């Protein structure tokens, strides 16, 4: 992760930022991307691609992934953030190959550059980018809902309650957070928090 737009794009500068150059690709992200989820995505790839020869890569990356899954599912703790950093550094220093040594980079660089997003996931149980489903809550604004029943009819979990021509509500215990209701609402009465 490179937070500063003015960072020169060369091997040494990227390495100093905790990133790397080699594949010739670069991904630009904005506030609609969850950095915790992005680091989880890259770590998931690493876990799948690991040859399994060395313990830091084989076991360590699985533990990192488990912690990231906990965090994106709203079950993470502040201790997990410390453990991510500590374990990531151990893997980086002790893995035997280039894949293993660079595998914790997405976690370490997002922790370094976007620590506040990790804290929001853990303490506030929120994802500012609205990417982590477990941390989302769908609500219906009663002032905008006219009770057209479109969301009610299309909810696959039967989580929407309400009579025709009266404001509806979403039962958060039944809601599977699929977004179908929001996609169907023509009155923009459904919000994600």
Predicted features along the sequence, with ranges:
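Extended hydrophobic/Leu-rich segments
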Residues: 1-2, 193
């Amino acid at each position: 992760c490179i937070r500063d737009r003015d960072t020169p794009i060369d091997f040494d500068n990227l390495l100093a930022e905790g990133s790397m150059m080699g594949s010739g690709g670069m991904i630009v992200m904005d506030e609609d991307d969850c950095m915790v989820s992005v680091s989880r995505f890259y770590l998931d790839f690493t876990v799948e691609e690991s040859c399994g020869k060395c313990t830091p890569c084989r076991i360590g990356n699985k533990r990192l992934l488990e912690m990231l899954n906990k965090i994106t599912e709203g079950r993470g703790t502040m201790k997990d953030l410390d453990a991510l950093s500590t374990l990531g550094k151990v893997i980086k220093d002790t893995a035997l190959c280039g894949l293993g040594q660079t595998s914790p980079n997405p976690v370490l660089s997002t922790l370094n550059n976007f620590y506040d997003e990790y804290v929001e996931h853990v303490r506030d149980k929120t994802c500012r980018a609205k990417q982590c489903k477990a941390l989302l809550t769908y609500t219906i604004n009663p002032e905008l809902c006219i009770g057209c029943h479109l969301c009610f009819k299309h909810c696959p979990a039967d989580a929407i309650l309400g009579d025709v021509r009266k404001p509806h509500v979403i039962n958060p215990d039944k809601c599977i957070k699929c977004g179908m209701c929001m996609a169907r609402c023509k009155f923009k009465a459904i919000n994600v928090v």
